[in-house]
Amino acid sequence: MYATLGNHDYFINPQAITRAIEDAGITVLHDQAIPINRQFWLIGRPDNLDSHRLPTADLVRKTNPAQPVILMDHRPDHVAEHARLPIDLQVSGHVHNGQIFPANFIAQTIYRPLSYGYQAIGNGHFVVTSGYGFWGIPFRLGSQSEVWIIEVRGK
């Protein structure tokens, strides 16, 4: 299993959170592109609160262009840019689908072209989940907690 850090991880102690995640047997990708079973590439980017994170295009250049590329990027705020890169699938979160109605409409305005759900855009497929957590108060209205299971099949 693989993970990337989100904005709330940077509010606390990203190093301690990374250690805890890795102690649970999950690899945290921090500006890394790694081959998986010689079949596809997985890129993990930290949240944009990390002011030293690399541009996505630099990470994509580290992959084999003949193989599929999956990108984990916490925020969906670069979807339009990523749709022009050779990224086959991007998975993101952060927005919580607005968490409390009517904030989902605000999220749709801020995170264009995709703040929640699935959409094929440009070169790739994009998924933004509402996740299982919350921001601020532990409450949701009009947005369900969720974990997506994405099955990827080859040709």
Enumerate the predicted regions with their spans.
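Soluble catalytic domains of enzymes that build or remodel membrane lipids, polysaccharides, and related
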Residues: 1-155
